[in-house]
Amino acid sequence: MATSKPASIAMISLGCPKALVDSERILTQLRTEGYQVTPSYDDADVVVVNTCGFIDSAKAESLEAIGEAIAENGKVIVTGCMGVEESVIREIHPSVLAVTGPQQYEQVVLEVHRAAPPKADHNPYVDLVPPQGVKLTPRHYAYLKISEGCNHRCSFCIIPSMRGDLVSRPVGDVLSEAERLVKAGVKELLVISQDTSAYGVDLKYRSGFWNGRPIKTRMTELCAALSELGVWTRLHYVYPYPHVDEVIPLMAQGKVLPYLDIPFQHASPRILKAMKRPAFEDKTLARIKRWREECPDLTLRSTFIVGFPGETEADFQYLLDWMSEAQLDRVGCFQYSPVNGAPANELDGAVPDEVKQERWDRFMAHQQAISAARLQTRVGREIDVLIDEVNADGAVGRSSADAPEIDGCVYVGNAATLRPGDMARVRITAADEYDLHGDAV
């Protein structure tokens, strides 16, 4: 008896790694139901666009992607953070089939069913989905989302209005997913959330179970358990709460990568207060010094905003001086951009665009010099490098100091035998502002 052809889905995933995990979850469910995933508009029965709505430029990119999908395919379902602005989307693109917000996985799947019904004779026991689900990253690393939402109300941010308050995943579920990923060949787990250090607060840190033993739903205990899997564990989106000090010994012992991604956003106490950043009075520089004393190889990554309403030249100079003292390893910087619905829009003291640009240029030049000097200290050392790509010129990988896509790379010569996913020992021979160069040994 002839069988029906399975429907095909194309997915466009925009924005942060947290949105990428949402896309993976949607695709995994659809694959379980027999849908095929295609990278082509032409072969897709319907296109799902997972949007970003964090800042205006991200919204513009999302609207452009929706328009392209409509032009190339015609049957488009919109989801993700910008989905909370359905009226805006439908005003510009009235032909979209459906619009859903973030975390509405079941609704997205339902809308896909309506647009392209699943294959009636699909047998899930024959067409198996791998235990780790559908992944959109290379097979040797994966994002591990531990919670959704955020309890903070930073004045420049609208994420809580889109994704709600903090909801932590059960620790047993997180660890079981991590275990499946490692069994599937993942060499690096990138722990993500809106606020990783708040993991478990909403659950009052109650214990869950993994492999028959109790584990507290808390960042430190989660990291200790993840270290048992024998792969790199990298922490992202960590706020500098006091208990963050507890993970530094795990890093010093080699159980967790010596890498902390902490979005400081600014250094001026006055601007931090206007931003309504948590723990803005912390003596952060003193803590950074203590962390590095305990774990000398610690890499610190952060992001900053310049040109925030009310930022004076004195505030900006305070930030530059703080950067000189902090000696952060990896830094991103954004010019402040008003976000529809953010309380910061009501603040006085808007900074002119040309001043924002000038401060951004100075900030990046300042940090570039710091980065170059810090990377220079690695020349002559041997380090472990996880290989991401192999080409005619050699291999490209990342050290413990480099998260994918946002940090630098290690360019590796003498790499004829290396393959993506290999862990190579590399002697560093040169460094520039952001990257290292070396040879496999």
From Swiss-Prot:
CC cofactor note: Binds 2 [4Fe-4S] clusters. One cluster is coordinated with 3 cysteines and an exchangeable S-adenosyl-L-methionine.
One of the GO BP terms on file: tRNA modification
Annotated keywords: 4Fe-4S, Cytoplasm, Iron, Iron-sulfur, Metal-binding, S-adenosyl-L-methionine, Transferase
Subcellular localization(s) per the UniProt record: Cytoplasm
InterPro entries named in the record: Elp3/MiaA/NifB-like_rSAM, Methylthiotransferase, Methylthiotransferase_CS, Methylthiotransferase_N, Methylthiotransferase_N_sf, NA-bd_OB-fold, Ribosomal_uS12_MeSTrfase_RimO, rSAM
Cross-referenced PROSITE patterns: MTTASE_N, MTTASE_RADICAL, RADICAL_SAM, TRAM
Catalytic activity: L-aspartate(89)-[ribosomal protein uS12]-hydrogen + (sulfur carrier)-SH + AH2 + 2 S-adenosyl-L-methionine = 3-methylsulfanyl-L-aspartate(89)-[ribosomal protein uS12]-hydrogen + (sulfur carrier)-H + 5'-deoxyadenosine + L-methionine + A + S-adenosyl-L-homocysteine + 2 H(+)
The organism's place on the tree of life at top rank: Bacteria
Domain TRAM: 376-441
GO molecular function, one term: aspartic acid methylthiotransferase activity
Binding site for [4Fe-4S] cluster 2: 150, 154, 157
Domain Radical SAM core: 136-373
One GO cellular component term noted in the UniProt record for this chain: cytosol
Start and end residues of each MTTase N-terminal domain: 7-117
Residues annotated as binding [4Fe-4S] cluster 1: 16, 52, 81
E.C. numbers: 2.8.4.4
The protein's enzyme class: transferase
Cofactor(s) named in the record: [4Fe-4S] cluster
Assigned protein family: Belongs to the methylthiotransferase family. RimO subfamily.
Function summary: Catalyzes the methylthiolation of an aspartic acid residue of ribosomal protein uS12.
Official protein name in the record: Ribosomal protein uS12 methylthiotransferase RimO
Organism of derivation: Bordetella petrii (strain ATCC BAA-461 / DSM 12804 / CCUG 43448)
